[in-house]
Amino acid sequence: MQRNAMYLKNVAETACNFQLTQYQISHANQKPYECQICGKPFRKRAHLTQHNRIHTGGKPYECKECGKVFICCSTLIQHKRTHTSEKPYECLECRKTFRRSAHLIRHQRIHTGEKPYKCKQCWKAFASVSDLIDIGKFTLMRDFTNVQNVGRHLTIAQLLFSIREFTLVRSPLNVRNVAKHSIIAQHLLNTRELILMRNLMNVRNVKRLLGKVHILLNIKEFILVRNHMSVSNVGRLSLVFLILIDIREFTLVKNPMNVKNVVELLTIVQLLFNTREFTLVRRLMNISSVGRFLSPVQHLFNIREHILMKNLMNVSNARRPSSIMHILFDIKEFILVRNLINVSNVGRPLLLFLI
């Protein structure tokens, strides 16, 4: 009996000495136990043993319900509560229950108003570490913002001039997704930066990003090679679109256009003297279509420029593009070699034909 009493006394003293040693280590901020693989220090040997399982891959604790394995016993206990729906931690203020004590501590800060985590960039305080980590993504060097967002962690970013930083290579975006990222996006001068190579766009999608699109002088930059467009789509991009002198730049080679589509693009078109530039080689036009393009056409002295070689015309068609046709001194220029006229047809294209 005396031996058992002495043994229990020694065990109690040893346990007290061990606890005292651990307590003193916590005050001295010492971490005497170091991992031999990565060099990370720990205060307790049990923490080092648990950490070594990360390197060895050992997971000795297994759930009997679903067979999932864990590194430490406490994680297994928390996992079992998902099967039993047990929530032992209750808030005394609102009686809300939680599975983990850490969740209860974070919830209680809502009632107390405590925000112990502060951002070093703007000194804004947060109730949880996860909120601080999430909001820190907007202030890192790789996630650029503009001056309006500095000091204000905005979930809705405004005026993101370099939105490429918010898009990964393997998950390309189109302009429809850009609008969800930036609700107020105005005057993005370089839209090419908003388009990745694997997800092409057309001009129809540009309208959903930019509410007010002013005069785009060089719309070639908004069109990629594999997704061609026609001039009928250009009109939906620009509300106020002025005279495009050289519309050839707005039409790609594989998607030619005719003058019928040009009228949908240009609301105010005045005196386009060289219509050949608005017609591509593979889709020819005749003079009957020219009248739909130009509402006020005056003084077309050299109408040969409006007629292509493969679509001949006669003098009966020459009357349609010009409502006010003055004296044509040399009508030979309006007659091609393969479509001859006689004297009876000469009087038809001219309203006022003088000597």
UniProtKB/Swiss-Prot annotation:
Q: Does the keyword Repressor apply?
A: no
CC terms in the record's Gene Ontology section:
nucleus
- InterPro entries assigned to the protein according to its UniProt record, in alphabetical order: Sp4-like (IPR039938), Znf_C2H2_sf (IPR036236), Znf_C2H2_type (IPR013087)
Q: Which residues cross the membrane?
A: none
Query: Where do the ZnF regions (C2H2-type) fall?
Result: 33-55, 61-83, 89-111, 117-133
Q: Which SUPFAM superfamilies does its entry note?
A: beta-beta-alpha zinc fingers
Subcellular location as annotated: Nucleus
Q: Which domain of life is it from?
A: Eukaryota
Task: Check the record and name the SMART domains matching this protein.
Answer: ZnF_C2H2
Reply yes or no: does the keyword Transcription apply: yes
Entry's family note = Belongs to the krueppel C2H2-type zinc-finger protein family.
> What does this gene product do?
May be involved in transcriptional regulation.
Q: What's the protein called, per UniProt?
A: Zinc finger protein 781
